[in-house]
Structures are given as structure tokens and as C-alpha cells.
Design a protein with these regions (language model features):
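Feature captures the catalytic cores and cofactor-binding loops of soluble hydro-lyases/lyases
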Residues: 23-24, 28, 32-49, 53-116
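N-terminal, charge-rich interaction modules
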Residues: 1-21, 25
């Protein structure tokens, strides 16, 4: 599944408006959920979707460092403008939803994200 398809199917709001087509059509390789950046750095893998409630600028840095396909901010968590600026500069898709992380992750799993 491609990032854009995931955003469309789950009706997620794209926050990074200046990302490339390559970023939007990157393959989703799996998923990871955590609000601790250190856990994401140690356990998330390139190509994964990261579900978090964090919206500060270090989220974009970690996503870029790992090579994540996108960051999904759940639970109507606030996302700082600095975060979006860094994400756009690093071609990282950031999207948001007011749905709780648990429900979002369940829907992603039902779509096949993370299934081997």
C-alpha cells in the first residue's frame, strides 16, 4: 500500500503540503506506534508508518533519520509549525486525525499494514 492510498482510505488530513510525489507514493512497509522518540529510533524500521501523539520538531528529525514512510499524529495531537517546516524540508509526510491511536492502528492492521 502506498502512503497516499493509506491517507485517502483512512481519511487522514495531510499536513505537509510541500512533500514530493515520491514521498506520497512511497510504499508502506509496516507500522510502529510509540510516543517515545527513543523507542522509535531503536525499533522503527525504514518504510514504516509511525503513529504517535507527538507533534514537536524532533518527530520530523527522527522520521528522517530512520527513513519512515510517514508520521501519523493521532488523537488530535497538536503539530508545531516548526515540525511541518522540517518535515517538508526533509520530504517526510505528516498527517493527522482526531481518532485515538488504538482505533487508527486497528484500521491500519485491518488494511494489511504490518501483516506479513
Amino acid at each position: 500500500m502506498k502512503v497516499k492510498e493509506l491517507l485517502d482510505v483512512l481519511n487522514l488530513k495531510l499536513l505537509t503540503k510541500d512533500v514530493s510525489e515520491d514521498a506520497l507514493y512511497a510504499e508502506v512497509e509496516g507500522g510502529y506506534a510509540s510516543d517515545l522518540l527513543s523507542n522509535a529510533m531503536g525499533q522503527a524500521q525504514p518504510g514504516m508508518v509511525w503513529v504517535t501523539m507527538q507533534g514537536h520538531q524532533n518527530v520530523a528529525a527522527v522520521a528522517s533519520l530512520i527513513g519512515l514512510s510517514c508520521v501519523l499524529v493521532a488523537g488530535d495531537g497538536p503539530v508545531a509549525e516548526e515540525t511541518l517546516h522540517k518535515a517538508n524540508m526533509n520530504d517526510i509526510v505528516v498527517a493527522a486525525t482526531d481518532e485515538p491511536a488504538f482505533e487508527l492502528i486497528g484500521k491500519m492492521y485491518a488494511l494489511g499494514v504490518g501483516k506479513k
